Swiss-Prot record:
GO BP field: tRNA aminoacylation; tyrosyl-tRNA aminoacylation
Record function comment: Catalyzes the attachment of tyrosine to tRNA(Tyr) in a two-step reaction: tyrosine is first activated by ATP to form Tyr-AMP and then transferred to the acceptor end of tRNA(Tyr).
Lineage: superkingdom: Bacteria
GO cellular component, one term: cytosol
GO MF terms held by the record: ATP binding; RNA binding; tyrosine-tRNA ligase activity
Keyword Cytoplasm found: yes
The keyword DNA-binding belongs to this UniProt entry's keyword annotation: no
EC code(s) of this entry: 6.1.1.1
UniProt name for this protein: Tyrosine--tRNA ligase 1
InterPro entries: aa-tRNA-synth_I_CS, aa-tRNA-synth_Ic, Rossmann-like_a/b/a_fold, S4_RNA-bd, S4_RNA-bd_sf, SYY-like_C, Tyr-tRNA-ligase, Tyr-tRNA-ligase_bac-type
Gene3D superfamilies: HUPs, RNA-binding S4 domain, Tyrosyl-Transfer RNA Synthetase
Lineage: Bacteria, Bacillati, Bacillota, Bacilli, Bacillales
Motif residue range(s): 'HIGH' region: 39-48
Location of the motif 'KMSKS' region: 230-234
Length: 418
């Protein structure tokens, strides 16, 4: 099965140019393709993973991806999908973000020891040295104002306002494609559905600049959720690929909590499971949704891909411990992950009567309530029900000398830090 047939099965083609010529090109030779990533933060998030994994799919099919980091365009700001002007970052900030993103991209693509190695590029290398006269004379003259105003990325901002800075973004991205076409023989640009206008503008610039040019564009569909909320966001914010921003446990939980209505679609979009494996999981969703086999497969595949096998095993262990209440089996680092958002209090490492600990840590509102909680069996210390009113929390209750986990009731956890 060819790459296009695989993408069609997965629902990964939104729009593409010249279907027949594009398919023939992919069948005939190893094609260089690119996708751009503007450094707007010091980490990629799962929304970025979608096109990154497209580059990976093409590489696995024998093609040569170029991961383009927008060190230049990142200082301008892409108006696509934005209702208001972006806040511009400083040159130093963009440079820092660029390096961070380059490091993350290297985790998903093979840059050496393969016949079709990926390439990393930074558009600041050519945009940073571009003078205004050359830009307007050699590039700008190829873009008619009416043509640009008709593009969705610009048209959608005309009423609310768009600066010349963001208005020029389309031209800069088009120049990226031309530069990569001329110097790297890059024939294909891929991007999100909101990039169609920028991609076709780049194709038009190549057509005007290069005789008999053959270049192509492909966009992937917007990732949606059946409940109408935005994909990739939680109450805690974006789901990042950096484990310091989003722990592997949180990352795993994000995928595990996928709605039954979305899980098969996400298996197709994000994983590298075979068609047969996905169809089998789809069958299990229909026949036994309560087993959540598809969600477990999705969480495992994505966490392993981004954070590795060891982090996946940790995430599964933390999830199982929280579900069963067997939290004493967790290490300190696993507790840090699993209890990141749990109410916590700092205490000195001294022996303390449990009743006093409950009140002083505001786990129980009063001593009377604390006594009731203990005698009623509502208090657990490191997963063990504790009903003795004279129980003293000692060194033996401090996991690795750092934590004591108190549970009140079925699911209300509190973390004591030492």
């Amino acid at each position: 099965m060819g790459i296009l047939q695989d993408l069609e099965f997965r629902g990964l083609i939104n729009q593409q140019t010249d279907d027949e010529g594009f398919e023939q090109l992919l069948e005939k030779e190893s094609v260089k393709l690119y996708c751009g990533f503007d450094p707007t933060a010091d980490s990629l998030h799962i929304g970025h993973m979608y096109p990154v994994l497209m580059l990976r799919r093409f590489q696995l099919a024998g093609h040569q991806p170029i991961a383009l980091v927008g060190g230049g365009t990142g200082m301008i700001g892409d108006p696509s999908g934005k209702k208001a002007e972006r806040t511009l970052n400083t040159k130093d900030t963009v440079a820092y973000y660029t390096e961070s993103i380059k490091n993350q991209l290297s985790n998903f693509l093979e840059f050496e020891n393969v016949d079709n190695p990926a390439t990393m590029a930074n558009n600041y290398d050519w945009l940073g040295n571009l003078d205004v006269i050359s830009f307007l004379r050699d590039i700008g003259k190829n873009f008619g104002l009416n043509y640009m105003l008709a593009k969705d990325t610009v048209a959608s901002r005309l009423e609310t306002g768009i600066s010349f800075t963001e208005f020029s973004y389309m031209i800069l991205q088009s120049y990226d494609f031309l530069n990569l076409y001329q110097h790297h023989k890059c024939r294909l640009q891929i991007g999100g559905s909101d990039q169609w206008g920028n991609i076709t503008a780049g194709l038009e610039l190549i057509r005007k600049s290069e005789e008999d040019a053959k270049a192509f564009g492909l966009t992937i569909p917007l990732v949606t959720k059946s409940d109408g909320t935005k994909f990739g966001k939680t109450e805690g914010g974006a789901i990042w690929l950096d484990p310091e921003k989003t722990t592997p446990y949180e990352f795993y939980q994000f995928w595990i909590n996928t709605d039954d209505r979305d899980v098969v679609k996400y298996l197709k979009y994000f994983t590298f499971l075979s068609h047969e494996e996905i169809l089998e999981l789809e069958k299990q969703v229909a026949e036994a949704p309560e087993k959540r086999a598809a969600q477990k497969a999705l969480g495992s595949e994505m966490t392993k891909l981004v954070h590795g096998e060891e982090a996946l095993e940790q995430a599964i262990k933390i999830s199982a411990a929280l579900f069963s209440g067997s939290v004493a089996e967790l290490t300190a680092s696993e507790i840090e992950q699993g209890f990141k958002d749990v109410p916590s209090v700092e205490r000195t490492a001294e022996d303390t009567v449990l009743i006093d600990l409950l009140v002083e840590s505001k786990i129980s509102p009063s001593k009377r309530q604390a006594r009731e909680d203990v005698t009623n069996g509502a208090i657990y210390v490191n997963g063990e029900r504790t009903q003795a009113l004279d129980y003293v929390v000692t060194e033996n209750d401090r996991i690795e000398g750092k934590f004591t986990i108190i549970r009140r009731g079925k699911k209300k956890y509190f973390l004591i830090r030492y």
